[in-house]
Amino acid sequence: MNYTFQAEQARDNLINEIRNLAEAQGFTRVVIGISGGKDSTVTAALCARALGAENVFGVMLPDGEQVDIADSRRVCAALGIRSRTVNIGKIHTALREATDQLGPVAGEGEFVVPPHRESDINVGPRLRMTVLRYFAQALGARLAGTGNLSEATVGYCTKDGDTSCDFATLLGLTSVEVVRVGLTMPEIPRDLVQKTPTDGLSGHSDEERLGIRYADIHRYIREGTCGDPETDEKIRRKEQANLHKRRMPVTLDPFAKGADA
């Protein structure tokens, strides 16, 4: 497969896409969740170039103590965008305590809710999305998505969490390509563009949790294979299992014919 990527052209295309969308839909402001990682950093920079830094609002959403929140502040300062911080830690704790009270024992007519670590981990992104939607509506702004194609392909994202947005800024770029685009924008700190991606939830890097390198996912997407059949199959299985995260909910047809009730 013949693959070429022009980072500067991709950057300029995305800036124009944001401007065109804003004009078509009649909005001038965007809200972005700023994690301090490459995806939100590059998204914020693209939006600032497209709409002006004064129209970009960064929201920092630590869950309790965030050890690298200084990186989030650096992004906002470097781009000249205004920001606010909302700590979702107490909200997450309250929800965790409420669900813990359900316990492993169910009363008559109730069902058992077993403890589930991944469910708890995914509460964070969903709470963040609730706060971001609040800010966007209050400011009359659109919510810019920050997820990339590599994450979406293997389902490394939270349904109704970071997948929720009004436009998906980077969903046409792999993780590798996001870095390349980011490196064409001198206004953002280079080290943040090249920062090791983590989920900010489990204490592990993305690649550690996935068991797959982003470079391999990139090659799988752009070349059809990463060069290792076993890894290709691992990516393919994740892709198929997580298609539901990339599609609108299935609408059932009440007028379908030929089905037995």
Describe the residue ranges of each PLM region.
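ATP/NTP-dependent adenylation/nucleotidyl-transfer catalytic domains that generate, transfer
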Residues: M1-I32, L46, E54-F57, D63-E65, ...
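Conserved G/P- and acidic residue-centered "switch" motifs that form tight phosphate/ATP-binding loops
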Residues: G37
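Generic detector of well-ordered alpha-helical packing
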Residues: S40, L149-A152
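Active-site signature of alpha/beta-hydrolase-fold catalytic machinery across serine-
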Residues: V42-R49
